[in-house]
């Protein structure tokens, strides 16, 4: 029985570790797959890119089983952090849309997205897709992919997990996510509040008109119009966050916050 050549075993281990790093990103981020892509395609994409990385890395000694398992755990942790950073701008837009729908009283108007088996806010799904299109048009998605693949130059597969850098960059990304979501949803909140105040005033001055029930469609439309204004204002910021995500993953892999 012939044994596997050491060089082939080493490259296979490198390919496996690289694929483990990229798999969470392929699962979560629309820039490298995403939830709407079939699982088999996402796994194949991560495995294929991992094989490319293994062919470009210099040959090394094959690791033992314990070293390979520890390296896999570190790569999985790093991949989860990278997936969060890359997905943060899209999730900011989705959170803004869901918050705006909640403020407009449209919480029941949710869409069932069959491929990912979850319910999604109509405005949230629209804004998330809008950010992906804007990022692709501006070229920010290519910066993200280049940043992800560039992590293998600064942090070889199986290297130590940069906990301090990952924590710092992740906290900044989380704060940007919350700030961007509120920036987009704030005009919708203001529009809905103004409409509610106007309706309350009309109902108090002339209750016989029944304006509260009759004006509900206008109230919802005003909130949607304000949401569109907020999204148009913050669109550049979200695209900038997508581009910065490419820089963020490089900072995490490089170990410098």
Model-derived features: positions:
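Hydrophobic alpha-helical segments and their helix-loop boundaries in membrane
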Residues: 1-257
